[in-house]
Every structure is written in structure tokens, then in C-alpha cells.
Amino acid sequence: VENKICGMTVSPLTERGRQQARKLGEAVKASGVHIDEILYSPLSRAADTAMAIAKATGLPARCEPRLREQCFGKYEGTPRNGGEFRVSKTHFADRYSGGESMMQLAQRIYNLLDELRADTDKTYLLVAHNGIARVVQSYFYDMTNEKYAAAGIKNCEFVEFTF
């Protein structure tokens, strides 16, 4: 893949991505971890991954709009290592031109996690994006700006968090 900022851009799974999703579904089923429901981002790359997991596990799956990736505005589709973007992403409170700020993203995800935390009788599998994973990690762990910037997960990585 091209190492460009996808954000809200429609970017379907590649064949490799579909294979990873099928393998993840098998791994989730084999893990023995109790899961009640899959919640997934409305973006097709996450939705297709969630459907592959649901097919392998038999778990119900529901679209959760708050799990959509951050909107990077004018930076959508540009190289991740672009100088202007690298500087902009260090300004957490500033909204990307035509997009949303890191603070807005964090509020959206923290509100969702607070709701899931209050639903104590259920366990959820979230299928989303690396930017969302970073915010989820910051919900559970204290992080410096540097640790936050370096945080994330691999494609189709299965990570468990407990409230």
C-alpha cells in the first residue's frame, strides 16, 4: 500500500487485507475470548473486516459510526511523511483544514468507551482504524505526546483491554 493518509477516504481492502481479515476471524474464534458483539467503523475497509470476523465466529456485528477514522481534511490522500502534515499533527487542539482535531476524535471515542464501560454485562470487539486504536490506548494508559504519536497497532491485530 502507498503509505498515504486514508482517514475518511474510501479505501477498500486489498487481497492481502481480506486474507488478514479471514485469519483474524479464525484467530478470534480459536482464542476462546468471550465476545458478545462486534462493533465496527462504517468505512468499508473496517466493515469488510468485521463481516469476515462475524462469518468465522458467528458473532453479531453492528455498525458504530463513532468508530470511523479521523477526518484529516486537506491531508486525505497525501503522503504520511509530508512535512506540513507532520507539523500539523502535533497540534492536538487544532482542527485540520476541512477535517477534525485530535481532541474532537478523542472526545468521540472516549464517549463511546464510557458507554461501553457502563454496559458491564457485555464484551465488545471493536473493528476500526489505527488512529482509533491509538485513542483507545490513550484511554487505558497514560501517554506522553511522544508515546501517543508512536502508538498504534498492526493491521488485524487482536488486542484486549479490560475496564
Model-inferred region functions:
Residues 24, 28, 105-116:
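Generic hydrophobic alpha-helical segments
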